[in-house]
């Protein structure tokens, strides 16, 4: 059995961007599955708020779990609201109402304001 070459460094543990191809026994190459995460976006926001601060991979994992959890809660609540109102489409109105129901006080106000701003920016760029 040939020895693995030492020239190419092994991918870091926990690396999310695995696009290299793994070698199979029969010689065929297969792509590794891509692991989706919000880490790029969390990092961009961190640098906007605190440019001189870093984040550990464990903390990034926690942030990724947090974003996924909030996303699922908002989507679930918006789906319920659409169902209650006999609608088959989740619109920005359902999302906004779901955010108001799920997030407490001032946080909900800021989230709605930022969401409205993002939707306005998106529609004006079309």
Swiss-Prot record:
The modification N6-methyllysine is found at residues 47, 109. The modification N6-(beta-hydroxybutyryl)lysine is found at residues 6, 12, 21, 35, 117. The modification Omega-N-methylarginine is found at residues 87, 93. The keyword RNA-binding does not apply. The modification N6-(2-hydroxyisobutyryl)lysine is found at residues 6, 13, 21, 24-25, 35, 44, 47, 58, 86, 109, 117, 121. There is a cross-link at residues 35, 121 (Glycyl lysine isopeptide (Lys-Gly) (interchain with G-Cter in ubiquitin)). GO terms for cellular component: nucleosome; nucleus. The modification Dimethylated arginine is found at residue 80. This is Histone H2B type 1-N. The gene is H2BC15.
């Amino acid at each position: 059995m040939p020895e693995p070459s030492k020239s190419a460094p092994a991918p870091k543990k926990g690396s999310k961007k695995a696009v290299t191809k793994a070698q199979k026994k029969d010689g065929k190459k297969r792509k590794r599955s891509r692991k989706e995460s919000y880490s790029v976006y969390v990092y961009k926001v961190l640098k906007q708020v605190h440019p001189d601060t870093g984040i550990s991979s464990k903390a990034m994992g926690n942030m990724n779990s947090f974003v996924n959890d909030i996303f699922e809660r908002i989507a679930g609540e918006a789906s319920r609201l659409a169902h209650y109102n006999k609608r088959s489409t989740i619109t920005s109105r359902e999302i906004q109402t779901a955010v108001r129901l799920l997030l407490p006080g001032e946080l909900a106000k800021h989230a709605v304001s930022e969401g409205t701003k993002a939707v306005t920016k998106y529609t004006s760029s079309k």
